[in-house]
């Protein structure tokens, strides 16, 4: 019982956090730890994680420390030592982290991984099979800044599908690297589209999309790589909306430039092109690279502007660049001249 009115006692998570900061002076001072101090922190974090009630206290500090180490070293040697530490097995109890690290589909950021971040029912069996520690860690992963940005992106894409269907008679839309196309579940007007062509190179994703959304008559799932859009951008005709929201994070500048030009050429007059990229300063990157083996090619506004600058100005009616609500993803909306 608290015998001092007006004085709130710290909860368990706050007490753990106070203990972490108290033991590791450099955390409080905001300075770079030495390799010895970093290793001591990882040892301490692993010891605390044996009680999964400590997860909320540890998660934020762990993410920040891994990001700090990533930025300071500029190499991946520290990944190997961290993955050999007992903390790696504990963190891989978290199903999203384990899936990303194992890469069952052979590449990073696959559609089932995104289902984890969406907290979609398709990922529920994996989560239900996780340990208590894994489930506690999952609550942190899905509420991280990168995950929240992905969740917001899903709603944003649904809104652009709706706007296009409501704005343009007989509208046609093209989605590149569509994954499972889960944004369809948030739309209200997708059934008004005459054609919704959804391309993905992963046959498992295309099959899942067909299975889940077979009732949408306008949906045209296609198993294809983005190379088709680069080499033959008009092979599927022209569209009122084209978007590639989760693709640019994996493209080098040359490929991104060529793809952007190809998508613009496949727009109808007055059509809209939306593409997006994770920004550079995201605290989750250290954890993603070290524990999930998931690497992105981040871009801020200047890099995105350079992609836009490669487009023929005569074709452009308007360009809007904006960030998502938590400032983690930058979007570019290009409107083609009518």
Task: Describe each region flagged by the PLM.
Residues 278-295:
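Short, glycine-/aromatic-enriched active-site segment of Class I SAM-dependent methyltransferases
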Residues 250-263:
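A short, conserved alpha-helix within the catalytic core of class I
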Residues 231-242:
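A short acidic, Gly/Pro-enriched loop at the edge of an enzyme's catalytic core
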Residues 295-314:
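Short alpha-helix
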Residues 202-204:
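Conserved SAM/SAH-binding beta-strand->alpha-helix loop
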Residues 270-278:
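Conserved beta-strand signature within the Rossmann-like core of class I S-adenosyl-L-methionine
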Residues 179-193:
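Conserved SAM-binding loop of SAM-dependent methyltransferases across substrates and taxa
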Residues 1-126, 134-139, 143-145, 160, ...:
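N-terminal accessory segments
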């Amino acid at each position: 019982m608290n015998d001092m009115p007006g004085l709130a006692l710290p909860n368990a998570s706050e007490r753990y956090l106070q203990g972490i900061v108290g033991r590791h002076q450099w955390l409080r001072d905001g300075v770079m730890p030495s390799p010895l101090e970093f290793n001591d922190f990882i040892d301490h974090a692993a010891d605390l994680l044996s009680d999964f009630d400590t997860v909320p206290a540890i998660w934020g500090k762990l993410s920040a420390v891994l990001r700090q180490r990533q930025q300071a070293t500029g190499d991946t040697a520290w990944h190997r030592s961290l993955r050999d530490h007992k903390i790696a097995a504990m963190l891989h109890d978290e199903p999203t982290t384990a899936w990303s690290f194992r890469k069952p589909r052979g590449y990073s950021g696959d559609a089932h991984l995104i289902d984890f971040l969406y907290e979609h029912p398709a990922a529920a069996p994996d989560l239900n099979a996780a340990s208590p520690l894994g489930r506690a860690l999952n609550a942190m992963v899905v509420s991280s800044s990168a995950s929240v940005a992905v969740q917001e992106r899903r709603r944003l894409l649904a809104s652009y599908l709706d706007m296009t269907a409501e704005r343009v008679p007989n509208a046609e839309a093209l989605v590149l690297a569509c994954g499972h196309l889960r944004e369809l579940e948030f739309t209200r007007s997708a059934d008004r589209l005459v054609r919704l062509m959804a391309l993905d190179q992963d046959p498992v994703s295309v099959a899942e999309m067909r299975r889940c959304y077979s009732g949408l008559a306008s949906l045209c799932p296609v198993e294809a790589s983005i190379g088709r859009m680069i080499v033959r951008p008009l092979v599927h005709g022209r569209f009122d909306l084209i978007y590639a929201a989760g693709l640019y994070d994996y493209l080098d500048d040359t490929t991104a430039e060529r793809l952007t030009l190809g998508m613009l050429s496949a727009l109808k007059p007055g059509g809209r092109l939306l593409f997006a990229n994770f920004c550079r300063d995201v605290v989750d990157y250290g954890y993603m690279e070290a524990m999930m083996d998931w690497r992105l090619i981040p871009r801020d506004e200047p890099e995105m502007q350079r992609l836009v600058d490669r487009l023929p100005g005569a074709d452009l009616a308007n360009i809007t660049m904006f960030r998502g609500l938590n400032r983690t993803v930058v979007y570019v909306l290009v409107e083609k001249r009518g």
